[in-house]
Each structure stands twice: as C-alpha cells, then as structure tokens.
Amino acid sequence: MTVTAGGAVLHAVPAGAQTVSESAARLTAVSSTAKAATARSARSAKTVRSAKAARAARQTSKARRAVAVARHQVGDPYRYGATGPGAFDCSGLVQYAWKKAGVRLPRVASSQFARIKRKVSWRNLKPGDLMFFNGLGHVGMYVGHGKMVHSPRTGERVRIDKLGGWRKSSFVGAVRPGA
C-alpha cells in the first residue's frame, strides 16, 4: 500500500515481506556460500590435477627405467621363449624390462596388447610404450627419436632400429604400461 503524507511517499511493507537490509543480508549469505562452494570446487579440481600429474610422473619414471633396462640388453641373442637375462624373445625382452621397472606384464605379445588398457597412436608414442607389429606377432619398445629396441628373430640379437618403412605399414597399435 502507498500513502502520501506531506509530499512524502510512504510504502507499507506487507506482513512477512523482507526489508531491503534483510534482503541484502540474505544476498550476502548466498554470495558467501557460492564463493565457498567455488573455492571447494577449485581445490577439488586442483587435487584431481595434482593426482593425475603424480601418476603421470610415476609412469614416466618407470618408463625411463624400462627403456634403460631394455637398452642394456642390446647385443643379447634372440631365443624363442626366452625371458632373460642373457637371451630374449621379443615379448620376453619388454616383459623383463618393465618388470625391472616395477610393472608386471603378461608373457606373450598378444596378451600384453590385450591386457594393457592405455592404447596409444603412432603419433603419440613416448619412450617405454610397447609397439606391436605383424598382427600382434612382434613387439618392441619405443625409446624415443623415432627408434625402438627389440629382439627381432632367431639368429639375430637385441638391437635398436629406426622406425619407418615396413614397420609403419605393419604397425598394429601401441600401449603404455604403468599408466
């Protein structure tokens, strides 16, 4: 209701309605609650990012170790079914290297590809990634700079080869152990 008294306009506040100061107080409380919720959400997001970064750092550290172990086997002979030390087949080499880095892998290439969930494209390879060729019949470990370490076949030795040519055309996929 509006009443005029001596040139002044007075508004009557209906029963149960809020005054301007009460509305301002409620708005301030809502704003404070929203700010607190936003701060909690930001802290939670930061914690999630920190946890992901820590996992990625652990995986990278293990991958470096696996690459170093695999590189150390260069010159060892290929022997079908061998898991080292001293002789390896292709899947035995990568299994041995990752085991030394603290990650257990299945024994054969096809199981390694199937059981490791983190799949990686050719363009996104990182050192330590396992690369599969020839319908999962061969596996090697990416060591960076367009090269892989692998135990090729009977009569040959563990070696580091450049990627390209037939390897790219027979590439099936790659996985990232320990991720």
Residue ranges and their predicted role:
Residues 61, 100, 122-126, 132-134, ...:
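Extracellular/periplasmic catalytic domains that process cell-envelope and extracellular macromolecules
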Residues 2-3, 75-88, 133-168:
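Glycine-rich catalytic cores of cysteine/serine-nucleophile enzymes that process amide/ester linkages
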Residues 62-66, 70, 90, 97:
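Stable alpha-helical elements in mature extracytoplasmic
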Residues 173-179:
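Short, low-complexity, Pro/Ser/Thr/Gly-rich segments in the mature regions of secreted, periplasmic
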Residues 76-126:
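Catalytic cysteine-centered active-site loop
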Residues 1-58, 179:
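N-terminal secretion targeting segments of exported proteins
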Residues 69-72, 128-130:
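Short, functionally critical alpha-helical segments immediately adjacent to catalytic or ligand/cofactor-binding
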